């Protein structure tokens, strides 16, 4: 059978360091407001697509988002776009967060966006981060990616921008 790596989230690490900083508190307050208004926390599915096995960034993002108050799901490693979309729908997530390091973003992310469009899924956003050359950003935005992050972005930026996009009146579609 096919190898399946298990991934888990270690929460509390990021929050214990930043819990008194205004940026951290601003985001956690926004998440609490979302919970009050929607009856549940914002939910993100963090994934790696294809054969990209560099999962450290995805683990860091997952742990930080949990500390911000998001419900966090982590997709198994080495998933195809259809498998990620299926899990995102089943888990009723608001955000699909794609971590990429191995240049699969040029084909795999547009394939994932096509799967979402084919299924008329318009109630979730897609964000991605990793080593994505600036020259590829327009292609990904055209495919429907809401935001793209790189090593220059802080985790606070990633959470804040992702939250802002998920609360826009029209997410995708």
Residue ranges and their predicted role:
Residues 164-170:
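Conserved small/polar residues in nucleotide/adenosyl-binding loops
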Residues 1-5, 117, 163:
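Non-catalytic alpha-helical coupling and interface elements of nucleotide-dependent molecular machines
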Residues 54, 105, 165:
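Histidine-centered active-site/metal-ligand motif
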Residues 1-83:
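Non-catalytic terminal/interface segments that mediate subunit docking, oligomerization
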Residues 58-160:
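Cofactor-cradling patches in redox/metallo enzymes
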Residues 8-11, 146, 169:
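Compositionally biased, low-complexity repeat tracts
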